[in-house]
Amino acid sequence: MSTTIEQILDRAFGHPRGLLGRVGGMVMAHGNGATERHVVDVARLTPQETVLVVGPGPGVGLRLAGQRAAIAYGVDPSPEMLGLVEARCAAEISAGRVRVMDGSAERTGLEEASVDVVLSVNNVQLWDDRAAGFAELLRVLRPGGRLVLSAHDKWLPVPRHALAAELTEAGFTDLQTWVWQPPGVTAPLAAQLRARRPG
């Protein structure tokens, strides 16, 4: 693939910025919407829980999490995505149910043991340092808290069972992994993982 095409794709989807980032966000809202909703369903959020959504993109899953849980935090390093989240989640932000912050998996800005659930959809392949990201997510989860992660199977940085092994090495327990086919003829197969912080 040419460097120019790679740069365009990175600006639209990998590290969204500028006009391409905003267009990429609209594409993500449509293309990832079913997976975002599925991951929120798999997490079985309760009205008393606090949720962290890593890389919420345009905010489809974050908005739903904010409607189901007590509060949902969204951390994203892209100003364009944060702007789309603020627009999509305006009512939830106004109600105090959603908060958005500049951040990443490796740098959430949250206190230790401050969330019950962490959700991540289609961004683990973009993290700068997966080991540091998993360590940070374990740190912010309360004892017994759960992680639900989903990514396009074909874009995983390593096979899903190897990703599960990385989670175990980071200190997560009760690992489960499976694949899920989102609706739609062209939707890529999603690799999904669920894990808990011990306690």
PLM region spans:
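Core SAM-dependent methyltransferase catalytic element
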Residues: 183-199
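Class I SAM-dependent methyltransferase SAM/SAH-binding core
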Residues: 50-107
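Conserved beta-strand signature within the Rossmann-like core of class I S-adenosyl-L-methionine
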Residues: 144-151
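A short SAM/SAH-binding and catalytic strip from SAM-dependent methyltransferases
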Residues: 117-129, 153
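A short glycine-rich, Lys/Arg-flanked "PGG" loop and its adjoining helix->strand segment in the class I
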Residues: 131-143
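Conserved alpha-helix/loop element of class I SAM-dependent methyltransferases that forms part
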Residues: 29-49
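N-terminal, positively charged/glycine-rich alpha-helical extensions of SAM-dependent methyltransferases
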Residues: 1-20
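A short acidic, Gly/Pro-enriched loop at the edge of an enzyme's catalytic core
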Residues: 106-118
